[in-house]
Amino acid sequence: SCVSLLGAKPVFADVDYNSQNITAQNIEKLITKRTKAIICVHLGGMPCEMDPIIRLAKRYNLFVIEDCAQAHGAMYKGKSVGSIGHVSTWSFCNDKIMTLGGEGGMITTNSKRIDSFARAFNNHGKNFKKLSPQLKSKIPKFKYIHDDIGTNYRMTEMQASIGRIQLKKLQKWSQARAKNANEIYKAIEHLPIARIPIIEDHLKHAFYKCYVMIDKKYLQVGWSRDKIIYEINARGVSCFSGSCPEIYLEKSFKKSYKISLKNAKALGRDSLMLTVHPTLTNKEIAKIKTAVKEVLLLASK
């Protein structure tokens, strides 16, 4: 939506079936003279394969924007996601790994130009270089300081305080999320019907959620991914289908796009999403493992 609101046209690349992320190979097929930037979404906390994407962006002189909304604490080759591209966006919505009491977000960048623009944009378009001398003057005079159109998307001090406290807890939370996800994976890894995402050694997964893909060739007659979700929920365990797989099918985009992306479509059909947040107790994780394993066994040939 943010791309469309600027009057630009988002172009959708297919994703890798294992990571659910876009790849340099799929991006390059879509680059034209009108392409301005690449948006990499580290979906579910799984980092994108960034080195090939950065090389591609340099070759075509494109900006790289990292969407880290679900990836607080994720790492790529020892670097935090969000520190690799030109600019990154973070979400502190109430469901995210970090939250600021309901809503909020953050932009990070190592570009002074982008930083200056972002600070002005979220504060009515003020040029702070012009504002600073005015505040220091013994006899302040009125000065025109709004160089551009802006907003009032300012974070409150209370929200920032909550975020700073949560930052100190992030490492411990990340460890708990990984532990919870790995316990679920161990409970079902021997089942042919369950395909567990491969996490390469150079990646640190943030585990915003725990994804499992259903291998449809092992499904019993009369079973589907949706029936599996229903049965897991019926056992008192939260289970979802995951992020929107084919966003171009949303009504807001459907008229403009006549495409079907193979892997995105397959993931929309096959994915299960389970909760692994750090406040879950050992008893609750045990309940999740039991319910998921029980239902997958029932659904298996």
Stretches with model-predicted labels:
Residues 25, 37-41, 46, 50-52, ...:
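PLP-dependent aminotransferase class I/II
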Residues 90-91, 105-111:
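Short beta-strand-to-turn element immediately C-terminal to the catalytic PLP-Schiff-base lysine
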Residues 16, 32, 95, 215, ...:
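Residue-level recognition of the GNAT/N-acetyltransferase active site
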Residues 66-101, 142-146:
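Conserved active-site segment immediately N-terminal to the catalytic lysine
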Residues 11, 64-65, 89, 195-197, ...:
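Structural detector of well-ordered beta-strand residues that form the stable sheet scaffold
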Residues 8, 15, 69-70, 93, ...:
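Histidine-centered beta-alpha loop that forms part of the nucleotide-sugar donor binding/catalytic region
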Residues 1-68, 75:
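PLP-dependent aminotransferase-like
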Residues 1-3, 56, 80, 97, ...:
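Hydrophobic/aromatic ligand-binding patch that stacks against planar heteroaromatic rings
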